[in-house]
UniProtKB/Swiss-Prot annotation:
Component of the NF-Y/HAP transcription factor complex. The NF-Y complex stimulates the transcription of various genes by recognizing and binding to a CCAAT motif in promoters. InterPro entries: CBFA_NFYB_domain, Histone-fold, Transc_fact_NFYB/HAP3, Transcrpt_fac_NFYB/HAP3_CS. It comes from the Eukaryota. Belongs to the NFYB/HAP3 subunit family. This is Nuclear transcription factor Y subunit B-1. Residues 53-64 are annotated as: Subunit association domain (SAD). It comes from Arabidopsis thaliana. SUPFAM superfamilies: Histone-fold (SSF47113). The modification N-acetylalanine is found at residue 2.
Length: 141
């Protein structure tokens, strides 16, 4: 693995322009919130730990997405879907995570199917403004 950070596309930043740091990483507040869930109530997390996890998460996402994208390109498809990501995780040795993610993806698709077309109708569905499903419908991991 290279010593310098690569772009999220996994191409070393050669995808037509440099990626701004704030676009490369998940927000540190989100990272911190997730990390705190694994600690006792009085636990503290150092800035260096948050920064390290932020970097690792970005690298992991790039790693999985790049593998899935390569698969899609070979199959002459332009859109990476959840099944492609699961395939990439299996290919790259993350089999232990597949079953819970398959369950999550199936539930997500089930909820999306139930809510298709209801996002604009004002029917009280739990879609957010961007058309996504709100967190209260999805299982909490």
């Amino acid at each position: 693995m290279a010593d310098t950070p690569s772009s999220p596309a996994g191409d070393g930043g050669e995808s037509g322009g440099s990626v701004r740091e704030q676009d490369r990483y998940l927000p540190i507040a989100n990272i911190s919130r997730i990390m705190k869930k694994a600690l006792p109530p009085n636990g503290k997390i150092g800035k260096d730990a948050k920064d390290t996890v932020q970097e690792c998460v970005s690298e992991f996402i790039s790693f999985i997405t790049s593998e899935a994208s390569d698969k899609c390109q070979k199959e002459k498809r332009k859109t990476v879907n959840g099944d492609d990501l699961l395939w990439a995780m299996a290919t790259l040795g993350f089999e232990d995570y597949l079953e819970p993610l398959k369950i999550y993806l199936a539930r997500y698709r089930e909820l999306e199917g139930d809510n298709k077309g209801s996002g604009k109708s004002g029917d009280g569905s739990n879609r957010d403004a961007g058309g996504g499903v709100s967190g209260e419908e999805m299982p909490s991991w």
